[in-house]
Amino acid sequence: MNFAAMMVVAIGIDLALGWPDALYKRIGHPVTWIGALIARLEKGWNFKGRLRRLRGVLVALAVIGTTVVIALAVQLWLPAGWPGVLIGGILAWPFVALRSMHDHVAAVAKPLIAGDLPGARQAVSMIVGRDPSQLDQPGVARAALESLAENSSDGIVAPLFWGCVAGLPGIAGYKAINTLDSMIGHRTDRYEEFGWASARIDDLVNLIPARLTGLFFALASPCRARALAVMARDARSHRSPNAGWPEAAMAGALAVRLSGPRIYADRVANEPWLNGTAPDPRPADLARGLALYRRAMAGMTLVIGLVAVLWSVS
């Protein structure tokens, strides 16, 4: 089956519809179903003891395995040819977040550009974990741009990459891994041991997509050479083995500095700067970042479309 064509169908539906509120109210969302399973297993299995890390490994394998097996069973049921591609694309659609990512960041950009800092702080609190009350205008713009860059990889490029590789088991399995990481893959007393496997698996499956995302941002920039240079120089200085690639490319493309020190509700994180000699982002840079995002994601869609065409004629 042409998995790349399946992903093109999913992209098209997501761009047209997003995930409608009426549908969410009626059935929720597949990621929330996965999250509910994780929460139930975490509640029963995450307690202190010598085998805490092993229990976390078993929970990660159970969640990923359950998701992949269900998705594989559905995929094997699909009819052959283009009807199967169309149905598969519809089923893959919930795992694509092109439209919602843009809308969430645009909801920050609108009040920020209008000078409504409280409104921008409220909007950015929906997409980042840091304390919004501590953010000035450049801080809000920086937080939103970093979220846009990192989540372009985690929420869009990576699931589509694995969807192209393996179809429904690939895209659904990736979202299970990413949801595990977001829920239990934290370096806290509660999760450092229990979430160890989830965090390591997430690092592994994002190695290629994160670098592809950085490349898409760099190639979509009018200043390609600068974006590529900043990405190559600074990406590895990020605390994450993957997030630094799209964030550094974004910083170089927009000629601003990203990452750096930030305040969370429970701690201060003194992170190194990406493109540290550049100025802080301004409100207008957030609009430029959204434009870069649109061009980069259009380029990604074109690449997937070309793969689909080559797949169909091979």
Curated annotation (Swiss-Prot):
Family, according to the entry, reads as follows:
Belongs to the CobD/CbiB family.
Main location as per UniProt: membrane
Q: What is this protein called?
A: Cobalamin biosynthesis protein CobD
Question: Could you tell me which InterPro entries the record lists for this protein?
Answer: Cobalamin_biosynth_CobD/CbiB
Compartments (UniProt record): Cell membrane
| A single MF term (Gene Ontology) | ABC-type vitamin B12 transporter activity
Q: Can you tell which superkingdom this protein's organism belongs to? A: Bacteria
Keyword annotations for this protein? Cell membrane, Cobalamin biosynthesis, Membrane, Transmembrane, Transmembrane helix
Q: What does this protein do?
A: Converts cobyric acid to cobinamide by the addition of aminopropanol on the F carboxylic group.
Tell me the NCBIfam families matching this sequence: cobal_cbiB (TIGR00380)
Pathway(s) = Cofactor biosynthesis; adenosylcobalamin biosynthesis
Spans through the membrane:
3-23, 57-77, 78-98, 154-174, 290-310
Biological process (GO), any one: cobalamin biosynthetic process
Q: How does it sit in the membrane?
A: Multi-pass membrane protein
Q: Which HAMAP family match?
A: CobD_CbiB
Q: Name one GO cellular component term.
A: plasma membrane
